Amino acid sequence: MEKIWLKQYEKGVPAEINIDEYTSLVQLFNESCKKFQTSTAYTNMGTSMSYGELDALSLKFAIYLQQLGLKPGARVAIMLPNLLQYPVALFGILRAGYIIVNTNPLYTSDELAYQMTDSGAEVLVVLANFAATVESALPKMPTVKHIVITQL
């Protein structure tokens, strides 16, 4: 099978990664951010983010999450479509030492409440467009202590 996505890789980005070189996904992420600091990491809706920007923003988000006083291994849910905020949240959660709970932004309030309760998520990161669903589900999500709302 032809790996057509490789044509999109910038010069110097390896086609394969030796996973034995890294002790964790966070280590791989940190080293990639340093190595490709000025390269584009993500592009969405006409806006690009470099690895350096992703590094800085995800670190700030990790610090914010830790300042909430969550214990190591706490669950943090992400209720976002494919936006630049998603990788910032994802890598911020990992860097803080927490567990990611991906959730569907199109869930009904009952589906969301079930997943949050079942997973034990304490934090929910959500796009403002879906805040009404969260508000409706909130009484049925006793584990959720913090909600982080982002905008388009």
Q: What are the residue ranges of the model-derived segments?
A:
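Conserved, well-structured beta-alpha core segment at the onset of a catalytic domain
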Residues: L25-V26, T43-N44, V76, L94, ...
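AMP-dependent adenylate-forming
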Residues: K3-L6, Q27-S50
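Flexible, non-catalytic linker and terminal segments flanking ANL/adenylate-forming cores
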Residues: M1-Y22
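Structural core segment of the AMP-binding/adenylate-forming
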Residues: Q67-L68, R95-L152
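Generic recognition of well-ordered alpha-helical segments
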Residues: Q27, A56, K60-I63, R95, ...
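Hydrophobic alpha-helical segments typical of transmembrane helices
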Residues: S24, L28-F29, F61, E111, ...
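Conserved AMP-binding/adenylate-forming core of the ANL superfamily
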Residues: E21, T38-L83, P87-F91, T108-A113
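Short, flexible loop segments at the rims of nucleotide/cofactor-binding pockets, characterized by
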Residues: I17-E21, E53, V101-T103
